[in-house]
């Protein structure tokens, strides 16, 4: 019997660390607290423009598009995921908040257990983070994996089985460290 408990304890000790991790989408409200506290200037703000995706295939470069005005016109909404942020911006937020970005593998391991609505197929707009599965709302920036390219996870409202397959784990989409877009945000790991 002792042997059984010892083996059981070893099994529990070796089980996935992801069970103790929570993946939280960073909202506009969260990001605003960071900006207000640190006076950080995002890559999109430095450049004075960013990419605004209009559908899965088309985009525009829009002056004034940044996390405060993702489409360059309308104010962002506190309860929505922050968008128009780059990898660089996500890293600075993570340092400030003393958290970290998930790896691509951690991201998928955690979201596999989330059974809330997946927003994609252009059926819904980007929705408040508390109401939906992280997958399919906005692309999430993940931690670098021995590369200068940033792998995005989870897909966005523009993805579907017929287009970019973003909500599929084996989909590969990379951007550089300075790229933001109206449907790119980030989530953080909370232990």
Can you name each region flagged by the protein language model?
Residues 3-12:
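Sec-dependent N-terminal signal peptides
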Residues 77, 126, 183:
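Short coil/loop residues immediately preceding or within conserved phosphate-binding loops
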Residues 62, 134, 181-183:
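Short, solvent-exposed loop/turn segments at the edges of secondary structure
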Residues 140-146:
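Short beta->alpha transition motifs characteristic of CBS
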């Amino acid at each position: 019997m002792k042997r059984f408990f010892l083996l059981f304890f070893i099994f529990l000790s070796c089980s996935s660390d992801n069970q103790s991790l929570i993946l939280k989408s960073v909202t506009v409200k969260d990001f605003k607290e960071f900006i207000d506290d640190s006076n950080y200037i995002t890559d999109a703000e430095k450049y004075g423009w960013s990419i605004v995706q209009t559908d899965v295939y088309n985009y525009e470069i829009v002056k004034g598009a940044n996390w405060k005005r993702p489409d360059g016109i309308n104010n962002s909404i506190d309860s929505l995921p922050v968008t128009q942020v780059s990898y660089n911006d996500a890293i600075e937020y993570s340092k400030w908040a003393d958290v970290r970005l998930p790896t691509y593998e951690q991201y998928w391991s955690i979201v596999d257990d989330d059974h809330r609505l997946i927003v994609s197929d252009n059926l819904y707009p980007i929705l408040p983070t508390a109401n939906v599965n992280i997958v399919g709302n906005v692309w999430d920036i993940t931690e670098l994996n021995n590369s200068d390219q940033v792998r995005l996870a989870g897909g966005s409202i523009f993805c579907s089985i017929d287009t970019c397959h973003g909500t599929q784990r084996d989909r590969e989409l990379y951007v550089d460290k300075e790229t933001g877009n109206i449907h790119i945000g980030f989530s953080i790991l909370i232990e």
